[in-house]
């Protein structure tokens, strides 16, 4: 399209050339006469008065330049060209005849009358330029200009459609391995390892925090009689009795009960290392230690399983062949991520049912007295108790009411004789006498017998929080908690440089121990494997917290217990004696009764390893004894025959690395096509579903006890053992003197796990103590799960091309290809038989998105292949170098395009597939519902005292009772001053052999055993389940270069590129010629009267007459020797032509304006609605005319412009199809195309009025090129016909299919790029009423729209009707 400036320039060129031509013609028609001689100069006459205006004479010679005049006023508007210069009158006069001969000189004449006005003087110098006048009116349209020069090349067009995929080339050489991939997602936990041997006793755990006090248990049944209590406090001294006679010496009394244990003596000297004791029983596995510090990166692991074949990638450009590097091994597995944060404490559970009554525990240390609880509510009145023995006289009560009149007293002494009076009547009751004096307190009565147990009081209110209790004994190990959820993956570390391949690393750490399996039958003793390599030294740990107080040395053996002497009378307390020297250790006495359990002692130092004794003969089996303590770990028995598979055990700790087995013999090569030998072990698959429980194997005979093996890694905590039977009650030892309470020591190092202490009475709940200082770092935890694969090593050298591997697993279908060229519709193919349902393959990872391939036509279904066994995944090849680009193959013979095959009948449901892989652990579920109410809680604490009972009758005074029983021991008194050292006691009898001490710390490793014989080969294991699908392999090697294909057909012409930037400015043009004369200016102001000049000389002969009348035509006469722009001409001969030029310019300007700002009319259509919207943003959405292919406007189309969305919408013609109901289908369950089959081949059309189908197709093609998005909806009106979802079945198998413009079929489900969406679905059930389903399809591939046809399925039945309403297609 020519720009406005270009057109205007062409027009001016044309006008200018026309003016030049006219000028040359005019110049040729005027003859120039000969120049006459110059006359003499006359004298200057006096200046006469100013005469009248004379007739214009010939122009005189040029005068001297005048001074520049002031700027003139603005002239009237010029013509559009601004080049209409005026020709000046300045020049030689035209037309004078030849000059006559000179006459004789006459006498001076008289002063003549004033001469006529002189001719107009020459024009002065140009004045200052005036202000620019307003733009003139637009001139008429000029003739079309010459074609302009080629514009700058446009921007490159959009890439053409992808060409046909060539045949696969031959396999290229292996490429260099790619850079290391990103760290993969953490894999699933591997399968549980086999159960490991029981580990050695774990290190004693730190004392657990004291548990909260439990709720009081129900009152147990009456216990057995308790041990003999401690000697009570001395009773009050009785009155001294009279000395009895000395009795005979009695026999020696029995050995008195042992007093309470004395306070620990001073530490004895460190004893010599004792012989190595028998291996202690395997203690319960300690809790899992905290994660150790990250170890050094392990060595490179073996290569993983080969991945499944990836999708065919896009053909790469030919790369330069690289130098083959050394083959890299996969990097080591990374360290596990950090342990996740501990979860929040869960809500307190409901009260559980009361457990069975436990066996009576040993008496615990007495707790500190708790603070008094709040007073409980009064209990109910108790039943009336038995009559108590007479109590002590009470204190005097308040005065009672007056008693009845007493009986007459005893007769008094005779009074003086009175006069005899008359006997009066009985007197009234006298007033109350004064109270008597309070009598002395009576003796205390005997304590009454205990009353019956009152009924259970109501639970008291909670008491105040008591003081923090002393640290209780270590509780039994708790049952293992459920494993916590896997923590979140740690942040990804920065990628390191690729290292050189390291040597093959040692085998992994031992697996975690599983549950104890049934003992196998005894097998032959296997040879010990060779020692494993020492691991690399770990990095130094961080500076630990300051250690606690060192261990106390072991206590010396107990001295002899002396016999108790006869009890003497209590003397006064003597002064403490000085401390005697320690006595020598006596021989051990016989076993005394079992004492109370003392607090656990601190660990002694480890003794040296003693020699292993010879094994004695096996004794006959004795009767089953009580459950003893766990025995020492025996040597592994010989392998028994494999029992049937047990239930899956809990995940065990990693096992000790086994020795490398000898290489087996190479098997014979199998036939091609069967699966090859197993590849290298792949990455751990997902955890499979648990297998069925195997039957219990027979119990194997016990193997011979082997030498004690080195302690294994710390095991996970074992399950809680059964409670052992209570030991016999020991006698109380003599009480030691109480020592001063020592200052609380710092937290000691972790001691060995003590035996379970006796359960003390439940103390009051202590206040939460402050957090203790951080303990020292724990021992190294068990080896964590394997980390993710390390980075790829240096590329290996390219290997030779191997034989073709077995067929890979069929990949998922590729994305639809690009649309092929439209072929002729072929005949419909036969329906293939239904294939057998294949096994459900594991879903492959998403392939790389391929370029859009051509849409293939549905072929006939081939016969089903038998499902081959799943091949083992080969090792991944290293990434090959990209092969050189293949030559294009010969074009294949164009096959006839068949009709789209009908949709096949839905096949029968496939056989149940194998169980899928176990998914990753789910997230923690929501908290469950509250459990049912628990059983009644145990008895509460005793209630407050009941209300006082009714006052009993006063008892008789009792006899003085015997001395009361000793009261309960009072609280511990404060520690008395240290006594003086006592004399050295006599050696006591030898104690019995003490119980087996706690297992000492691990002794030094024993000498290495000799290598055992090679074990028998194990039985062949059952064939494993098929492995899970491996990870994607590395990208396959590029194929060899294919042949070059033929030159593809030229793509469609791309849309016009955006307008290029303005070119550089051209050189400045030559000065234009002067324009036409301007219009006549206004008359100048009349000049002032000049002064009269002196008389001049006589003038020359008179001038020739005025010129003749102009000869017509364009008056560019010869007078126009010079162009001037400021001298108006008086002749009006130019004006009519000026108007023609002006009108032409104006018309041309209007046409250019309409090109730049289209009006959307049929004569002046826009290209798209977007152009209209940009030109007229104020316009409203409506119907307008557009011409997408530009050029002639005869094929413009009328569309609806939606200015709110910027869309150009084209209506279908017609919009509605008539209702259809009489179509009988040839085959049931087939989609039937409405336009192709039912309407006899007429598809939806989008013709605008006055435009043919071919012209409309061209306009639509341009619209698709100009748009980058398109959308359209279609409404399916139905009566008893399903359009999308069938509500009865919930399936979409009856949904309609739509055909797009490029023959693509748009469906209800499948590839999301070819599925439509449903806005309203009223046709989902059959109601005998008309309803509708509105379908919409939006795409960024405008080539797929508009819809050309629709294929419903659920039609043709009785009382079924449908019609279609096609919505507009909108491009944007």
Curated annotation (Swiss-Prot):
Glycosylation positions in this chain: 183, 1273
PROSITE patterns to which the protein is assigned, alphabetical: NC1_FIB
Positions annotated to bind Ca(2+): 1187, 1189-1190, 1192, 1195
Modified residues (5-hydroxylysine): 183
Keyword Secreted applies: yes
Record protein name field: Collagen alpha-2(I) chain
Short sequence motif Cell attachment site: positions: 783-785, 828-830, 1011-1013
Biased composition (Pro residues): 59-77, 1095-1107
Disordered: annotated segments: 28-1135
GO terms for MF: extracellular matrix structural constituent conferring tensile strength; identical protein binding; metal ion binding; platelet-derived growth factor binding; protease binding; protein-macromolecule adaptor activity; SMAD binding
Presence of keyword Cytoplasm: no
Keyword entries, A-Z: Calcium, Collagen, Disulfide bond, Extracellular matrix, Glycoprotein, Hydroxylation, Metal-binding, Pyrrolidone carboxylic acid, Repeat, Secreted, Signal
């Amino acid at each position: 399209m020519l720009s406005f400036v270009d057109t205007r320039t062409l027009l001016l060129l044309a006008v200018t050339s026309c003016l030049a031509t006219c000028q040359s013609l005019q110049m040729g028609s005027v003859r120039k006469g000969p120049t006459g001689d110059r006359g003499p100069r006359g004298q200057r006459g006096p200046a006469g008065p100013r005469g009248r205006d004379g007739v214009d004479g010939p122009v005189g010679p040029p005068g001297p330049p005048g001074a520049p005049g002031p700027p003139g006023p603005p002239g009237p508007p010029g013509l559009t060209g601004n080049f209409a210069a005026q020709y000046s009158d300045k020049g030689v006069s035209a037309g004078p005849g030849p000059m006559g001969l000179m006459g004789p000189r006459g006498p001076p004449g008289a002063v003549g009358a004033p001469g006529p006005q002189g001719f107009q003087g020459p024009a002065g110098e140009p004045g200052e330029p005036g202000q620019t006048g307003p733009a003139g009116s637009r001139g008429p349209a000029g003739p079309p200009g010459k074609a302009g020069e080629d514009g700058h090349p446009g921007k490159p067009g959009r890439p053409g459609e992808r060409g046909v995929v060539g045949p696969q080339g031959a396999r290229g050489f292996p490429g260099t391995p790619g850079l290391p991939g990103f760290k993969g997602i953490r894999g699933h936990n591997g399968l549980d390892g086999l159960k490991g041997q029981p580990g050695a006793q774990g290190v004693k755990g730190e004392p657990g925090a004291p548990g909260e006090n439990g709720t009081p248990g129900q009152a147990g049944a009456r216990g057995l009689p308790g041990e003999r209590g401690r000697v009570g406090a001395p009773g009050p001294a009785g009155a001294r009795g009279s000395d009895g006679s000395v009795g005979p010496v009695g026999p020696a009394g029995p050995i008195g009960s042992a007093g309470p244990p004395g306070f620990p003596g001073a530490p004895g000297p460190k004893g010599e290392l004792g012989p190595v004791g028998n291996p202690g029983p395997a203690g319960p596995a300690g809790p899992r230690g905290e994660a150790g510090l990250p170890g050094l990166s392990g060595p490179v692991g073996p290569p993983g399983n080969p991945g499944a074949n990836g999708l065919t990638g896009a053909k790469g450009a030919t790369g330069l062949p690289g130098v083959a590097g050394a083959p890299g091994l996969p990097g080591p597995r990374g360290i596990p991520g950090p342990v996740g944060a501990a979860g929040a404490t869960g809500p307190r559970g409901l009260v559980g049912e009361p457990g069975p009554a436990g066996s009576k525990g040993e008496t615990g240390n007495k707790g500190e007295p708790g603070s008094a609880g709040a007073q409980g509510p009064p209990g109910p009145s108790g039943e009336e108790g038995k009559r108590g023995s007479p109590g002590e006289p009470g204190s005097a009560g308040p005065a009672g009411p007056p008693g009845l009149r007493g009986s007459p007293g005893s007769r008094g002494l005779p009074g003086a004789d009175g006069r005899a009076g008359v006997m009066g009547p009985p007197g009234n009751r006298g007033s109350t006498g004064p109270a008597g004096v309070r009598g002395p307190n009576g003796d205390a009565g005997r304590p009454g017998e205990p009353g019956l147990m009152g009924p259970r009081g109501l639970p008291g209110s909670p008491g105040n929080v008591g003081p923090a209790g002393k640290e209780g004994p270590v509780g039994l190990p708790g049952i293992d908690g459920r494993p916590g959820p896997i923590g979140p993956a740690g942040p990804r570390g920065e990628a390191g440089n690729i290292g050189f391949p390291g040597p093959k690393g040692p085998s992994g750490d031992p697996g975690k121990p599983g549950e104890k399996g049934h003992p196998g039958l005894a097998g032959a003793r296997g040879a010990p494997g060779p020692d494993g390599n020492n691991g690399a030294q770990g990095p130094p740990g961080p500076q630990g917290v300051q250690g606690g107080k060192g261990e106390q040395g072991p206590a010396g053996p107990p001295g002899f217990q002396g016999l108790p002497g006869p009890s003497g009378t209590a003397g006064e307390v003597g002064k403490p004696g000085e401390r005697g020297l320690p006595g020598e250790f006596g021989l051990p006495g016989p076993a005394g009764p079992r004492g109370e359990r003392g607090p656990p002692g601190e660990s002694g130092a480890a003794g040296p390893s003693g020699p292993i004794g010879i094994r004695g003969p096996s004794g006959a089996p004795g009767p089953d004894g009580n459950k003893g303590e766990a025995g020492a770990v025996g040597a592994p028995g010989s392998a028994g025959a494999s029992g049937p598979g047990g239930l899956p055990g809990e995940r065990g700790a990693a096992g000790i690395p086994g020795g490398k087995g000898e290489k087996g013999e190479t098997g014979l090569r199998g036939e091609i096509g069967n699966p090859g030998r197993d590849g290298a072990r792949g990455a751990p698959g997902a955890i499979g579903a648990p297998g069925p429980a195997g039957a219990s194997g027979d119990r194997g005979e016990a193997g011979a006890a082997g030498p004690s093996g080195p302690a294994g890694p710390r095991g996970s905590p074992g399950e809680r053992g059964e409670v052992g039977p209570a030991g016999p009650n020991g006698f109380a030892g003599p009480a030691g003197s109480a020592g001063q309470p020592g200052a609380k020591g710092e937290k000691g190092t972790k001691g060995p796990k003590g035996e379970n202490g006796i359960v003390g009475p439940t103390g009051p709940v202590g206040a939460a103590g402050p957090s203790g200082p951080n303990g020292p770092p724990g021992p190294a935890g068990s080896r964590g799960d394997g980390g993710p694969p390390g980075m790829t090593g240096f590329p290996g050298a390219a290997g030779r091309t191997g034989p073709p591997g077995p067929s890979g697993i069929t990949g998922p279908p590729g994305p639809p290809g690009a649309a092929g060229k439209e072929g002729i519709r072929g005949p419909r193919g036969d329906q293939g038989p239904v294939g057998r349902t294949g096994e459900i393959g594991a879903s492959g990872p998403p392939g790389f998105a391929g370029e859009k391939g051509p849409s293939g036509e549905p072929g006939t279904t081939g016969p089903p292949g038998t499902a081959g066994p799943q091949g083992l995944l080969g090792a991944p090849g290293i990434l090959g170098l990209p092969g050189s680009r293949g030559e294009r193959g010969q074009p294949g013979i164009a096959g006839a395009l068949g009709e789209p095959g009908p949709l096949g009948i839905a096949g029968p449901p496939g056989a149940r597939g194998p169980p899928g892989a176990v998914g990753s652990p789910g997230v923690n579920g929501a908290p469950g519902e509250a459990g049912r109410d628990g059983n009644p809680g145990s008895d509460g604490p005793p209630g407050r005292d009941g209300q006082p009972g009714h006052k009993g009758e006063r008892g008789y005074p009792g006899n003085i009772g015997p001395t009361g029983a000793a009261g309960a021991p009072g609280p511990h008194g404060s520690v008395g001053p240290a006594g003086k050292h006592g004399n050295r006691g006599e050696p006591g009898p030898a104690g019995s052999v003490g119980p087996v001490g706690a297992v000492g710390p691990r002794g030094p490793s024993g000498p290495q055993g000799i290598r055992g014989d090679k074990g028998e080969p194990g039985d062949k294991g059952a064939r494993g389940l098929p492995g899970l699908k491996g990870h994607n392999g590395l990208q396959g090697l590029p194929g060899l270069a294919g042949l070059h294909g033929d030159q593809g057909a030229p793509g469609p012409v791309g849309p016009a590129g955006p307008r290029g930037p303005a070119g550089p400015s051209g050189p400045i043009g030559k000065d234009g010629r002067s324009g036409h004369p301007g219009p006549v200016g206004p008359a100048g102001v009349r000049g002032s009267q000049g002064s009269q000049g002196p008389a001049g000389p006589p003038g020359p002969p008179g001038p020739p007459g005025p010129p003749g009348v102009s000869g017509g035509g364009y008056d560019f006469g010869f007078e126009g020797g010079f162009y001037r722009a400021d001298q108006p001409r008086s002749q009006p001969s130019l004006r009519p032509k000026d108007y023609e030029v002006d009108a032409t310019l104006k018309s041309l300007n209007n046409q250019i304006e309409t090109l730049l700002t289209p009006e959307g009319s049929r004569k002046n259509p826009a290209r798209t609605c977007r152009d209209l919207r940009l030109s007229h943003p104020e316009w409203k959405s409506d119907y307008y005319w557009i011409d997408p292919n530009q050029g002639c406007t005869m094929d413009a189309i009328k569309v609806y412009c939606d200015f709110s969305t910027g869309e150009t919408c084209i209506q279908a013609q017609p919009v509605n199809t008539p209702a259809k109901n009489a179509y009988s289908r040839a085959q049931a369950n087939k989609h039937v195309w409405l336009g192709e089959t039912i309407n006899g081949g007429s598809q939806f059309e989008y013709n605008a009025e006055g435009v043919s189908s071919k012209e409309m197709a061209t306009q639509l093609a341009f619209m698709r090129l100009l748009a980058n998005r398109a959308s359209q909806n279609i409404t399916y009106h139905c009566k008893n016909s399903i359009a999308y979802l069938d509500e009865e079945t919930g399936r979409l198998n009856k949904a309609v299919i739509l055909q797009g413009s490029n023959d693509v079929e748009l469906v209800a489900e499948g590839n999301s790029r070819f599925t439509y969406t449903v806005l309203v679905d009223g046709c989902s059930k059959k109601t005998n009423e008309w309803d509708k389903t509105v379908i919409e399809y939006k795409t960024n591939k405008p080539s797929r729209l508009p819809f050309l046809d629709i294929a419903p399925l659920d039609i043709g039945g009785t009382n079924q009707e449908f019609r279609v309403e096609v919505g507009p297609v909108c491009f944007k």
